Amino acid sequence: VAELDAKKARVRVQAGPILTAWLPFATVRAGPDRTWHAPEAGEQVVLVAPGGDLNQAVVVGSLYRDAYPPPADSADISRTAWKDGAVMEYDRAQHHWRLSVPSGGKIVLEIGPSKIEMTDAGIRLTAPRIDLN
């Protein structure tokens, strides 16, 4: 990926000497339920180009490479790792869910008026009722 237009959900891809037009990229969901995880500059992607015209291509996925290896090495682990050090991971063998953000970050869980906020300074619970057992 050479460039990202996040507002239009399009990327330009450098394929050898060719810089493509702005191309759409695939996502997991794009209907009433939607996901967003845009490809970034420097990311290696796979293009499907009907008729071989790269300017009509669609980015259908990304590939690991030496600069950006897989973030896990087990089929039991589903893991997303961000460049700032944040990690979201589920290990189905251990039944363990982990969410980690770097120092200075915040984790917020909300359901209606109830909220849990976690920062370096502590944990704040806000709710109509709090039961401690």
Predicted regions and their residues:
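Exposed beta-strand/loop interface patches that mediate assembly or binding
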Residues: 1-95
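Intrinsic-disorder/coil detector with helix-boundary
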Residues: 102-133
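Conserved, well-structured core segments that form or line functional sites
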Residues: 87-89, 94-99, 106-108, 115
